[in-house]
C-alpha cells in the first residue's frame, strides 16, 4: 500500500486535506498550478487565496456555519486556525486579512515535513491515493479528464440554483399541497396569487438589483438556465406560461384556478427544506429576501440558501460520491471542496478536512469515517451524497440539514442552540478516535 496521497489543488479544501493527511504521518504530494498558470479569478501563488469576500461568515453558535467552524476547531483545522490568527474586526462574523490569512495557510502547510509541493498543472488524474480539490475554476484540461471519469451528464460548469427555504418558516395556512393535474402523489406546496398580488410581485422583481457578472461568466445565460428576473423582463405574462403557470393547480379551498402559482418542492430527505421551483436567480441576496417574501405564504420565509448563478465546476455527488467523499467507482480517489457541491469557504475546507482524514485512513488500512448527521460537517456530507440526483445543486451549511432533534422547540434561537450543543458534544466525542 502506498504511503502517500496526491492532493490536487491548494485552495481551502486542498490545503485542509493536505494538513489533515500530513499530521497523521502520511506523505503528501500537493499540486498547485499557480503561479505557472492562473485561473481568471486568482491573482497570487498563495494557498487558500480568497477570491471574493474576506468573511468566513458568522462565528456565533446560533448560526450553522458558526457551529461548523467550532466543529473544525475540535478537529485541528488548519484553515480555521489560520483564520482565527489573521482575523479582523467584523462584529459577529469571522473576517480575515486575506493576505495574512493566505500566507498563514501557505506557511503552515508548505512547511510541514510530510508535504512536498509541486507547482505545475495536473492534466490527468494520477494513480494511487488522490484527492481532487481543484475548485469551481478547474482548468480545461482537467475538466475534460473529469468528464471522461464521471460521465458528461454528471459534471456541471454552472451553478444555477433557486432559493431554498426552511419549511417551518412557510405559512402553511396560505399554501396547499398538490401536484399539477393531481398526477401522482401531492408533492408540491403551492403558493396561490391573485392578479393584484402577481402585479406587485412582478414590479418588485423587475426593479430588483442583480449581481454583476464577471467577465468569464458572461456566457452563463446561454446554458439554458434563464434567471427568473430575465424571464420577467421578456414580458409581464412570460412567467405565467413558465414556472408560475397555474394550469392544473386549482386551489382546493376555493375550487378555482389562481391567477398565478409559485411551487415549492421538497429539497431534502427529511422534508425540512423546500426550493422555489424554476426560480434560479441572479438577484442580490437582500433583494431576494424582499422580493420573494411578497409570495403568499413566504412572508416570513427563512432562506437557508440564496439563489445563485455563477461559474462553478462541480460533480453530481449523489451519483458519484460516498459520505466519506470517496469516489464510488475508485476506492482510492476522493473529492473535496466546491467541486463536491458544498458551497462556501468554510464548507469547502470542512469537506477537505473529512476527505483528508479518510484518505489518510485509507492509506493506513483503517476503516473510513462517516461523521453523523447530528454534526454540521456530517450533515453536509450526507446531503450532497443522498439528495435527489436529478435536481442536485450546491448547498451551504444550515440547521435544516442536521438530523431532527426529535422534539419540537418553537423558539428559533433555542432550537438552534440545541442543535449546536448536540453537534459539538458529538464532535468532541468523535475527535478522540480520529
Curated annotation (Swiss-Prot):
Lineage top rank: taxon: Bacteria
Region forming the signal peptide: none
Residues passing through the membrane, by range: none
Gene3D superfamilies noted in UniProt: FAD/NAD(P)-binding domain
Protein residues bound to FAD: 9-14
Keyword Methyltransferase: yes
Enzyme class: transferase
GO molecular function term, any single one: tRNA (uracil(54)-C5)-methyltransferase activity, 5,10-methylenetetrahydrofolate-dependent
UniProt entry keywords in alphabetical sequence: Cytoplasm, FAD, Flavoprotein, Methyltransferase, NAD, NADP, Transferase, tRNA processing
Location of this chain's protein in the cell: Cytoplasm
Cofactor(s) the record lists: FAD
Catalytic activity: uridine(54) in tRNA + (6R)-5,10-methylene-5,6,7,8-tetrahydrofolate + NADH + H(+) = 5-methyluridine(54) in tRNA + (6S)-5,6,7,8-tetrahydrofolate + NAD(+); uridine(54) in tRNA + (6R)-5,10-methylene-5,6,7,8-tetrahydrofolate + NADPH + H(+) = 5-methyluridine(54) in tRNA + (6S)-5,6,7,8-tetrahydrofolate + NADP(+)
E.C. number: 2.1.1.74
Short name of any one Pfam family annotated for the protein: GIDA
Gene Ontology CC: cytosol
GO biological process: tRNA methylation; tRNA wobble uridine modification
Sequence similarity: Belongs to the MnmG family. TrmFO subfamily.
Stated role: Catalyzes the folate-dependent formation of 5-methyl-uridine at position 54 (M-5-U54) in all tRNAs.
Protein name, UniProt field: Methylenetetrahydrofolate--tRNA-(uracil-5-)-methyltransferase TrmFO
The gene coding this protein: trmFO
Amino acid at each position: 500500500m502506498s504511503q502517500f496521497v496526491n492532493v490536487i489543488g491548494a485552495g481551502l479544501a486542498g490545503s485542509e486535506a493536505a494538513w489533515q493527511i500530513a499530521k497523521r504521518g502520511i506523505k503528501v504530494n500537493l499540486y498547485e498550478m499557480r503561479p505557472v498558470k492562473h485561473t481568471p479569478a486568482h491573482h497570487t501563488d498563495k494557498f487558500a487565496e480568497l477570491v471574493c469576500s474576506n468573511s468566513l461568515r458568522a462565528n456565533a453558535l446560533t448560526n450553522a456555519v458558526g457551529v461548523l467552524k467550532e466543529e473544525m476547531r475540535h478537529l485541528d483545522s488548519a484553515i480555521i486556525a489560520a483564520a482565527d490568527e489573521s482575523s479582523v474586526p467584523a462584529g459577529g462574523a469571522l473576517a480575515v486579512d486575506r493576505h495574512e490569512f493566505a500566507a498563514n495557510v501557505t506557511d503552515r502547510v508548505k512547511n510541514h515535513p510530510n508535504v512536498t509541493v509541486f507547482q505545475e498543472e495536473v492534466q490527468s488524474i494520477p494513480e494511487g491515493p488522490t484527492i481532487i480539490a481543484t475548485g469551481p475554476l478547474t482548468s480545461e484540461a482537467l475538466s475534460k479528464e473529469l468528464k471522461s471519469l464521471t460521465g458528461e451528464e454528471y459534471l456541471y460548469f454552472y451553478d444555477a440554483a433557486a432559493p431554498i427555504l426552511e419549511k417551518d418558516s412557510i405559512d402553511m395556512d396560505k399554501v396547499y399541497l398538490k401536484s399539477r393535474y393531481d398526477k401522482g402523489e401531492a408533492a408540491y406546496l403551492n403558493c396561490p396569487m391573485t392578479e393584484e398580488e402577481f402585479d406587485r410581485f412582478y414590479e418588485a422583481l423587475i426593479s430588483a438589483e442583480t449581481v454583476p457578472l464577471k467577465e468569464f461568466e458572461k456566457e452563463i445565460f446561454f446554458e439554458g438556465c434563464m434567471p427568473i428576473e430575465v424571464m420577467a423582463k421578456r414580458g409581464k405574462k412570460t412567467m405565467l406560461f413558465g414556472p408560475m403557470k397555474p394550469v392544473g393547480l386549482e386551489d382546493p379551498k376555493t375550487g378555482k384556478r389562481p391567477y398565478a402559482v409559485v411551487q415549492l418542492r421538497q429539497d431534502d430527505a427529511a422534508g425540512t427544506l423546500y426550493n422555489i421551483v424554476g426560480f434560479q436567480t441572479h438577484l442580490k441576496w437582500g433583494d431576494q429576501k424582499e422580493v420573494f417574501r411578497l409570495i403568499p405564504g413566504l412572508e416570513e420565509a427563512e432562506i437557508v440558501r440564496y439563489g445563485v448563478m455563477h461559474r462553478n465546476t462541480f460533480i453530481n455527488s449523489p451519483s458519484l460520491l460516498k459520505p466519506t467523499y470517496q469516489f464510488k467507482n475508485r476506492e482510492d480517489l476522493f473529492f473535496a471542496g466546491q467541486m463536491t457541491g458544498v458551497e462556501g469557504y468554510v464548507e469547502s475546507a470542512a469537506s477537505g478536512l473529512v476527505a483528508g482524514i479518510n484518505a489518510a485512513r485509507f492509506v493506513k488500512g483503517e476503516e473510513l469515517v462517516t461523521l453523523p448527521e447530528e454534526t454540521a460537517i456530517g450533515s453536509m456530507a450526507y446531503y450532497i451524497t443522498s439528495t435527489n440526483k436529478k435536481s442536485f445543486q450546491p448547498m451551504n451549511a444550515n440547521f435544516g440539514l442536521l438530523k431532527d432533534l426529535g422534539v419540537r422547540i418553537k423558539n428559533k434561537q433555542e432550537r438552534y442552540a440545541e442543535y449546536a450543543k448536540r453537534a459539538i458534544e458529538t464532535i468532541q466525542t468523535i475527535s478522540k478516535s480520529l
